[in-house]
């Protein structure tokens, strides 16, 4: 199954958003654990210098691969920045707000994804980051699709 992606020899930047989901589903169906899936994705995309951001975006259906990527990096003694969890105090909440952006951003995030401020505060940083990035990628993909449909309609 992975040969299908290898034959196309595509780079991560050229890959359509839907293909991320397809690749992730194939790897999950093959019963790979998180670290194996992450390594397979990196090898499949022929990109050894893949950034943390791209690795986090690869599988929109969950954070297992993002966590697997961190574990893999740690296993190989490579640096992979994971912000420390702040204390559950007002200072910690203020620190968390700065990490995510600012207080308005936290509130906006909570409203957009149907969560309370406390839930956002208690979410792992990687999860907050990945939800924002996946949402932005989905919106970009939708805008491109809308533009193509509009241009076909105008013809």
Which residue ranges define each predicted feature?
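An amphipathic, hydrophobic-aromatic interaction surface with interspersed Lys/Arg
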Residues: 1-155
């Amino acid at each position: 199954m992975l040969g299908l992606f290898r034959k196309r020899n595509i780079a991560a930047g050229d890959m359509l958003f839907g293909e991320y989901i397809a690749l992730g589903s194939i790897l999950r169906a093959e019963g790979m654990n998180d670290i194996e899936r992450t390594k397979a994705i990196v090898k499949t995309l022929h990109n050894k210098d893949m950034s943390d951001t791209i690795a986090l975006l690869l599988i929109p259906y969950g954070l297992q691969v993002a966590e697997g990527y961190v574990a893999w990096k740690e296993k190989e003694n490579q640096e992979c920045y994971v912000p420390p969890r702040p204390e559950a105090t007002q200072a910690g909440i203020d620190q968390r707000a700065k990490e995510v952006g600012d207080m308005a951003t936290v509130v906006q995030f909570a409203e957009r994804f149907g969560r309370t401020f406390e839930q956002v505060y208690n979410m792992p940083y990687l999860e907050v980051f990945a939800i924002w990035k996946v949402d932005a990628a989905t919106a970009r993909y939708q805008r491109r699709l809308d533009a193509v449909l509009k241009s076909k309609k105008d013809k």
